[in-house]
Swiss-Prot record:
Descriptive protein name: Integration host factor subunit alpha
GO BP terms: DNA recombination; positive regulation of metabolic process; regulation of DNA-templated transcription; regulation of translation
Gene3D superfamilies: IHF-like DNA-binding proteins (4.10.520.10)
Described purpose of this protein according to its UniProt entry: This protein is one of the two subunits of integration host factor, a specific DNA-binding protein that functions in genetic recombination as well as in transcriptional and translational control.
Natural source organism: Pseudomonas syringae pv. tomato (strain ATCC BAA-871 / DC3000)
Record family assignment: Belongs to the bacterial histone-like protein family.
Subunit text: Heterodimer of an alpha and a beta chain.
GO terms assigned for molecular function: DNA binding; structural constituent of chromatin
Highest taxon listed in the record's lineage: Bacteria
HAMAP family membership: IHF_alpha
GO cellular component terms given for this protein: cytosol
Amino acid sequence: MGALTKAEMAERLYEELGLNKREAKELVELFFEEIRHALEDNEQVKLSGFGNFDLRDKRQRPGRNPKTGEEIPITARRVVTFRPGQKLKARVEAYAGTKS
């Protein structure tokens, strides 16, 4: 099983919408740039029928160096989370196990 890349997304836009390759690539880049900007501005990104991107603050917590066993604090940080929407979940579940 492979991964869908931005280049492949642009290629599909080129093939299915008739955009030229440069326009398709720019559209994909702009889409992800808008998501990045919204998250940088502390905004939630809601894509109807797909899911939500959120920012979550994680507190500092104790961790361990796996080689030495030494306790090391894991610093507080902000992470991006994605919660799939109900429609996306339902479509993925409908196709689960149908492809090898």
